[in-house]
UniProtKB/Swiss-Prot annotation:
<protein>
    <recommendedName>
        <fullName>Mediator of RNA polymerase II transcription subunit 21</fullName>
    </recommendedName>
</protein>
<dbReference type="GO" id="GO:0016592">
    <property type="term" value="C:mediator complex"/>
</dbReference>
<dbReference type="Pfam" id="PF11221">
    <property type="entry name" value="Med21"/>
</dbReference>
<dbReference type="InterPro" id="IPR037212">
    <property type="entry name" value="Med7/Med21-like"/>
</dbReference>
<comment type="similarity">
    <text>Belongs to the Mediator complex subunit 21 family.</text>
</comment>
<dbReference type="GO" id="GO:0003712">
    <property type="term" value="F:transcription coregulator activity"/>
</dbReference>
<keyword id="KW-0805">Transcription regulation</keyword>
<dbReference type="InterPro" id="IPR021384">
    <property type="entry name" value="Mediator_Med21"/>
</dbReference>
<comment type="subunit">
    <text>Component of the Mediator complex, which is composed of MED1, MED4, MED6, MED7, MED8, MED9, MED10, MED11, MED12, MED13, MED13L, MED14, MED15, MED16, MED17, MED18, MED19, MED20, MED21, MED22, MED23, MED24, MED25, MED26, MED27, MED29, MED30, MED31, CCNC, CDK8 and CDC2L6/CDK11. The MED12, MED13, CCNC and CDK8 subunits form a distinct module termed the CDK8 module. Mediator containing the CDK8 module is less active than Mediator lacking this module in supporting transcriptional activation.</text>
</comment>
<keyword id="KW-0010">Activator</keyword>
<dbReference type="GO" id="GO:0006357">
    <property type="term" value="P:regulation of transcription by RNA polymerase II"/>
</dbReference>
<comment type="function">
    <text>Component of the Mediator complex, a coactivator involved in the regulated transcription of nearly all RNA polymerase II-dependent genes. Mediator functions as a bridge to convey information from gene-specific regulatory proteins to the basal RNA polymerase II transcription machinery. Mediator is recruited to promoters by direct interactions with regulatory proteins and serves as a scaffold for the assembly of a functional preinitiation complex with RNA polymerase II and the general transcription factors.</text>
</comment>
<keyword id="KW-0539">Nucleus</keyword>
<keyword id="KW-0804">Transcription</keyword>
Length: 144
């Protein structure tokens, strides 16, 4: 996973791509403007509603990417962060890490206990199958 600065750069690049694509679609689908009595043929092949759909699509993409950029910027450490604040934050993270490690150890212990029970049950099943088979073989053999 990339660090936050790389994610931020990727989001800014994505936003720039979306702006370029939106401008390209507007140039392609938009009606021509009239300049000083110059007559041009209007391309009527393009339906008007597709232009609106493109506008809505690009507006949604640009808004979502801008929101992602805001979230990434907010997650960056601030310049006002003092050494004491950073130490407190680090201490809190270490506590959370310790709690998660304790929880993980408990889950692993319970998993090991379940594994032992399953292995014991499988061994019992295998033993009973062996006894059943050996009992059937001894009964099917004729006595001499």
């Amino acid at each position: 996973m990339a660090d936050r600065l790389t994610q931020l750069q990727d989001a800014v690049n994505s936003l720039a791509d979306q702006f370029c694509n939106a401008i390209g679609v507007l140039q392609q689908c938009g009606p021509p403007a009239s300049f000083s009595n110059i007559q041009t043929a209007i391309n009527k092949d393009q339906p008007a509603n597709s232009t609106e759909e493109y506008a809505q699509l690009f507006a949604a993409l640009i808004a979502r990417t801008a929101k992602d950029i805001d979230v990434l910027i907010d997650s960056l450490p601030s310049e006002e962060s003092t050494a004491a604040l950073q130490a407190a934050s680090l201490y809190k993270l270490e506590e959370e890490n310790h709690e998660a490690a304790t929880c993980l150890e408990d889950v692993v212990y319970r998993g090991d206990m379940l594994l032992e029970k399953i292995q014991s049950a499988l061994a019992d099943i295998a033993q009973s199958q062996l006894k059943t088979r050996s009992g059937t073989h001894s009964q099917s053999l004729p006595d001499s």
